[in-house]
UniProtKB/Swiss-Prot annotation:
Region called Disordered, residue ranges: 15-124
Subunit structure: Homotrimer (via collagen-like domain). May form higher order oligomers by supercoiling of the trimers. May interact with ERFE.
InterPro entries reported in the protein's UniProt record: C1q_dom (IPR001073), Collagen (IPR008160), Collagen/C1q_domain (IPR050392), Tumour_necrosis_fac-like_dom (IPR008983)
Gene name tied to this protein: C1qtnf5
Entry protein name: Complement C1q tumor necrosis factor-related protein 5
Domain Collagen-like span(s) in chain numbering: 30-95
Signal peptide (residue range): 1-15
Domain of life: Eukaryota
Organism of derivation: Rattus norvegicus
Location of the protein in the cell: Secreted
Domain C1q: 99-238
């Protein structure tokens, strides 16, 4: 009987889990044991939350002055400003020179002659009455324009011994024609004519008798034949001073 009981107790002891001495209640506690050895490092934990924003720091000291930048593009033009006040009246300037308008005039007559002139050629009026500017040539009987503008020319002719027809000619082209019949009267007759014409520098004007028998221009002591012309107005806006 005893051997059987001993085997039973031995089996129970081997099949039960070992008991921790520290967990067995005891009426008389013992002294604390020695500290155990440190354990191994554990795995890294989860990241923590962001911390709160800190307070603004104090302003820093001013930095050094930087280099100047490139000039910018010109801006748009501004609106005109208000009109300023009138300035003081200036001093009176020196007196200027009076300008003289351009001049051109002449008058000439034929010398006494009883010989008829040739036809279709310039008729000279060789005795100059006025030619201050020298624009008329008494040798050729031609007027040469020096001042551009409008001119008036006139011819007063004595008609005797034959009928007379003459032209005012500009550069070889007739600009006006005049005629006087002579009927064998005992005294001379007269023929006058004139015209206005625009001339440019170097244009020429003269008198020319007609063809055939119409060459009865005459001159004597008491019966003159004259050719005259003068500038009516100039085309120059700013004319120089002419003597």
């Amino acid at each position: 009987m005893r051997p059987l009981l001993a085997l039973l107790l031995l089996g129970l002891a081997s099949g039960s889990p070992p008991l921790d001495d520290n967990k067995i209640p005891s009426l008389c506690p013992g002294q604390p044991g020695l500290p155990g050895t440190p354990g191994h490092h554990g795995s890294q934990g989860l990241p923590g939350r962001d911390g709160r924003d800190g307070r603004d720091g104090a302003p820093g000291a001013p930095g050094e002055k930087g280099e100047g930048g490139r000039p910018g593009l010109p801006g748009p033009r501004g609106e005109p400003g208000p009109r300023g006040e009138a300035g003081p009246v200036g001093a009176i300037g020196p007196a200027g020179e009076c300008s003289v308008p351009p001049r051109s005039a002449f008058s000439a007559k034929r010398s006494e002659s009883r010989v008829p002139p040739p036809a279709d050629t310039p008729l000279p009026f060789d005795r100059v009455l006025l030619n201050e500017q020298g624009h008329y040539d008494a040798t050729t009987g031609k007027f040469t324009c020096q001042v551009p503008g409008v001119y008036y020319f006139a011819v007063h002719a004595t008609v005797y011994r034959a009928s007379l027809q003459f032209d005012l000619v500009k550069n070889g082209q007739s600009i006006a024609s005049f005629f006087q019949f002579f009927g064998g009267w005992p005294k001379p007759a007269s023929l006058s004519g004139g015209a206005m014409v625009r001339l440019e520098p170097e244009d020429q004007v003269w008198v020319q008798v007609g063809v055939g028998d119409y060459i009865g221009i005459y001159a004597s002591i008491k019966t003159d034949s004259t050719f005259s012309g003068f500038l009516v107005y100039s085309d120059w806006h700013s004319s120089p001073v002419f003597a």
